[in-house]
């Protein structure tokens, strides 16, 4: 599978490296959950850098987990960062046997067992990020084609993400493909995470 992936360009923008370094970490919404436990659970979002050889470029493995159950993530993924000039394009991949790799964001021995053969591309679900001053603003690629079925209802993902060096703000909503009304996702506003630990030094140096 690795050979079928596009090669990384000869030149990579500093913005791609900056975004990758800012993403690489353990993010927690502890403060938000502490202040409003009725509406927000305490969640961690982990992004752990993959070795350069995985994509011949910059890649990340991610987990989203409840703080009380760190070994049972409710969302896992692999992400490939691609330089598109004035924007950073992030391809998203799912894991074929996701629970086999639970905890890989915290245990590098597990992370090493993830290979390109373990993942499948989530077409139409890529994210596009642009830098705006001291932050990156991102969202799912246009077209309303990142489809997710929930409770028998076909929905498309509407996603907003804002990243700084120390914070991660995100709001994911599932919208009915016919009525465009919200079916799932937060109705109380975005999740607000603060970086508790950085893994930026694990990002390959390709500049």
UniProtKB/Swiss-Prot annotation:
InterPro entries on file: CpcT/CpeT, CpcT/CpeT_sf
Query: Is Lyase found in the keyword set?
Result: yes
Induction annotation: Induced under green light, it is part of the cpeESTR operon.
**Class of the enzyme per the UniProt entry, highest EC level:** lyase
Which key words are in the record? Lyase
One matching Pfam family is: CpeT
Question: Which GO molecular-function terms appear in the entry?
Answer: lyase activity
- List the CDD domains: CpcT (cd16338)
Domain of life of the source: Bacteria
State the EC number(s): 4.-.-.-
Assigned protein family: Belongs to the CpcT/CpeT biliprotein lyase family.
List, alphabetically, the PANTHER family matched: CHROMOPHORE LYASE CRL, CHLOROPLASTIC
Q: What does this protein do?
A: May attach a phycoerythrobiline (PEB) chromophore to apo-biliprotein(s).
Protein name per the record = Probable phycoerythrobilin lyase CpeT
């Amino acid at each position: 599978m690795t050979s079928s992936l596009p090669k990384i360009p000869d030149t990579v923008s500093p913005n791609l490296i900056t975004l990758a370094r800012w993403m690489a970490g353990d993010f927690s919404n502890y403060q938000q959950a502490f202040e409003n436990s009725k509406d927000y659970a305490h969640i961690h979002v982990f992004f752990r850098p993959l070795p350069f050889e995985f994509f011949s470029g910059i890649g990340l493995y991610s987990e989203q987990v409840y703080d009380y159950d760190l070994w049972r993530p409710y969302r896992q993924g692999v992400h490939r960062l691609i330089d598109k000039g004035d924007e950073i394009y992030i391809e998203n991949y799912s894991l074929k046997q996701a629970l086999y790799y639970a905890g890989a964001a915290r245990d590098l021995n597990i992370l090493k067992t993830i290979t390109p053969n373990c993942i499948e591309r989530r077409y139409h679900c890529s994210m596009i990020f642009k830098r705006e001053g001291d932050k990156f603003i991102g969202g799912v690629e246009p077209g309303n084609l990142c489809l997710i079925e929930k409770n028998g209802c076909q929905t498309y993902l509407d996603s907003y993400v804002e990243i700084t060096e120390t914070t991660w703000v995100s709001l994911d909503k599932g919208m009915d493909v016919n009525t465009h009304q919200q079916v799932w996702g937060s109705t109380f506003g975005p999740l607000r995470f603060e970086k508790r630990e950085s893994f930026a030094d694990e990002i390959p140096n390709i500049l």
